[in-house]
Amino acid sequence: MGVLKIEEIPHYTYEDYAHWEGKWEIICGVAYAMSPAPMIKHQSISNKIARQLDEIFENCKRCKALLPIDWKLAIDTVVQPDNLVICNENLDKAYITKAPKIIFEVLSKSTAKKDEGIKFRLYESEGVNYYILVNPDEKMAKAYSLRDGKYIKIGDFIDEKLTFELNECDKPLEFDFSKIWE
């Protein structure tokens, strides 16, 4: 059996992705199949995150909390964060193009490595202000804040509150982690 050459590996684009069935992401042209359906615990936590983000961003009209939506970073890179906050983005398109201000990824066995590795570096390089990795099994979230182009760990959160400071909002906004584990 011969060795696979780099030029023989498929390089996918958004155009390819737009025609696929099922849930996929592409990062730098590499296709990643997503879990068919998240576990109930994953969905429950994601829904609680979404509700709380909706509430805290109610008074910040320039920002919107969203559930998974395509974020098209390049012709060959499209991801779908579990929960995200966008600001000053056109809401009439099928996907977003600007970096979200906040991203939550709820870890699962099938996505943890990608969320903690390639997506961590991708979100950092794209300028996502806050990245929160939520571990349902440990009931703990690791929060990172972007400082000078690099993520700095803010801390591990179980029942604490995290304050988001965004230029688009008149005042800091507080997220209560104790509410997502109930």
Language-model features and meaning:
Residues M1-E182:
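Gly/Pro/Ser/Thr-rich low-complexity, intrinsically disordered segments predominantly at protein N-termini
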